[in-house]
């Protein structure tokens, strides 16, 4: 090779090949969260990422399909990569569940947050509707008590399940995340027990 400096000109290399040791992925969760099949590539990518990879989820969403969010939460918890949730506008409803699963939370100034319970409809015989409502209530209590634990007070989670909406600005969300981190004691063996909170530039 004619290159004599410490820098290597890849255009002059012969019989040399490049292998990436890490990747940075940018995923844009913008607008409504749609059907789960729209996010199959995201889930697969997260599950096959390595500990050297970084995944940015750029959030500007008013929520949507909660079961799609639940599957993404599973993939976020399973991935070996570092997941950064960057809120860049709206983070509401089901989008807040995804946000709170990240390893690092970035919040842009003037972003807007809203936390509330799920919406659904029931049909069928009266007994079937009653059974469905009771099952949904039990499911929602378990989900929100886990997802919002440490971020919302137990009394606030109960109010959400009962129908109250909680609106927050970036400063309020940052304070709650920092308080949750101080209280958190990740179980032994937990890969990433604590979140980092960053104000996006």
Predicted regions and their residues:
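Terminal peptide-recognition signature
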Residues: 29, 57, 99, 113, ...
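Catalytic phosphate/metal-binding cores of nucleic-acid and nucleotide-processing enzymes, i.e., regions
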Residues: 6-20, 48, 58, 70, ...
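Short, basic/hydrophobic alpha-helical segments
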Residues: 44-52
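Conserved strand-to-helix beginnings and helix N-cap segments that scaffold or border functional pockets
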Residues: 39-40, 66-70, 96
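Charged, glycine-interspersed solvent-exposed loop segments at helix/strand-loop junctions
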Residues: 27, 55, 122-200
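Short, glycine-/small-residue-enriched flexible loop/hinge segments at domain edges that mediate gating
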Residues: 52-68, 82-89
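Glycine-rich beta-to-alpha active-site loop
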Residues: 77-122
